[in-house]
Amino acid sequence: MHPRPIILCLCALALTSCLQDDVDIRKGEDPVPEGGSSQQEESALQVNEKGLYILKDQKVYETGVESSGFSSIIMNENGDGFYIAHDEGLLYQTGFDGTVTSAVPLDPVNDWEGLAMDRSTGTIYICAERERKIYKVDMGSGTATLVLAGINEGSADNRGYEGLAYGDGKFFIANQEKPKRIYTYDVASGQLLSSVDLDFPAFLSDLCYDDRDGTLWLTDSKRQVLSNIKTDGTIIAQYDISFVQKPEGFCLDTAHGLFWFVCDNTNKLHSASYK
């Protein structure tokens, strides 16, 4: 297994790259090195004793949100900040440095978990864990409108829809436990297209769709592992994310070569480079 994407380094840039300091995201600044290009030097990630890739340049940012409960994160429409769901019913907007710019209370009140966005329209979707339902969010009013009832199966406790991703006209939904399963629905018709049981995670948490190759990224908040998988559940690569105490939320930032996480326990924002 190899982490993706891998960009071959240019020998002529090797010495210059060695002299550069690690990138530090400061308030108001872009998280890309000044003078950076689309062909930055990159080396293969190291692997730990568990066979997990070790991410580079791990950084943490305070959000100032006191009540624990961050559950999901997605990039905003402009790619310069985030939407973060809180399971007490709030949807936050933050910058790259964790600064909160708005907090919208969602109606109805629910145990909100996974976030997703249709990038072609900017439509935001969110899932309600215990209800096992998908809603569309109006950020102006905070109104959440039901769009998919889903399948009410499995345990009756709070181990339902935990992660949500949108891609290629489909919803991908992670059911946390009992069963540990990923459902795929056609968004337009609401038809269930497939369901795949997974045996490797302890808790299915957030999902992210990778539109470069149609694969999924899945966080396991209990084992502290990030997995890149095919939609049939086949593992492509796995990463150690134990630097996040309880990694509930994840999003992929291909523009900057970063993985972003939110911690359910601390409400901190974390980043790490996969390059």
PLM feature spans:
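Short loop/turn segments that connect beta-strands within beta-propeller blades
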Residues: G95-T99, D138-G142, D186-G190, I229-T234, ...
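Bacterial signal peptide processing site
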Residues: L19-D22
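Blade-level signature of beta-propeller repeat domains, shared across WD40, Kelch, NHL, RCC1
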Residues: G249-K275
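A short beta-strand motif characteristic of beta-propeller blades
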Residues: K56-G64, T99-L106, T143-S155, Q191-L198, ...
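C-terminal motif of bacterial Sec signal peptides marking the signal peptidase cleavage site
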Residues: L15-S17
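A short helix->beta-strand "capping" segment at the edge of beta-propeller domains
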Residues: A44-S68
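Beta-rich, blade/repeat-based domains predominating
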Residues: V65-E77, V109-R119, E153-D168, D199-G214, ...
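Conserved beta-strand positions in repeat-built beta-propeller and related beta-rich domains
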Residues: N76, Y83-E88, I124-R132, I173-K178, ...
